Amino acid sequence: MSTNKEIITDDFCFKVYDVLNSEHLNIKDILKKFKDTSEICSNLDDFIANNLIRNKDDGISNTYVIYYMNNPIGILFTNFHPVEEIDGKMLPDEIEICLGIIPRYQNKHLGQTLEREISIKLLEMYPTISFIVASIKDENIRSKKAAFNAGYTYFEGNQYHFNRR
């Protein structure tokens, strides 16, 4: 079951980020100290605040704390991108995801399971969306491998798509 405050998949619970929740603040602070935080975004605090505001406009963009076995393990961002034209191509509505898992839970194959489960769930929740996008830098081999194992395919540039089946 999923609500506006949380999304539940087989293995994970995604709770909407609460700026007053000390557990949520702690996960954010751990990620900010982690050297690969720039993979998530350069200014985590601003990104979280802006994403929570965007949710009021589109109802899809949001920031979530990821829970696995009742333990907070990271942060997920969902960003809605409406139909747009880029370089002469019309791109349909899409949801882009970005996630960061704290070091303690990395290298346990949670990333690929998490990406697969949240992508399937988002496509169930939003039937007009055809695919989920993950943007992964070329040098981030672990994340690219996790995305492929989760069912993503390479699209172009640094974009990988999880298509509706």
Which residue ranges define each predicted feature?
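A short, well-structured alpha-helix characteristic of acyl/acetyltransferase catalytic modules
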Residues: 1-50
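Active-site beta-strand termini and strand-to-loop segments that position acidic
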Residues: 9, 67-69, 164-165
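Acetyl-CoA-dependent GNAT
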Residues: 41-98
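Short, high-confidence coil segments that cap the C-terminus of an alpha-helix
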Residues: 61, 127-129
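A short, internal acetyl-CoA/4′-phosphopantetheine-binding micro-motif in the GNAT/acyltransferase core
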Residues: 96-108, 136-137
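Conserved acetyl-CoA-binding loop-helix of GNAT-fold acetyltransferases
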Residues: 101, 107-122, 144-149
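Conserved beta-strand-loop-alpha-helix junction that forms the acyl-donor binding cleft
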Residues: 121, 132-144
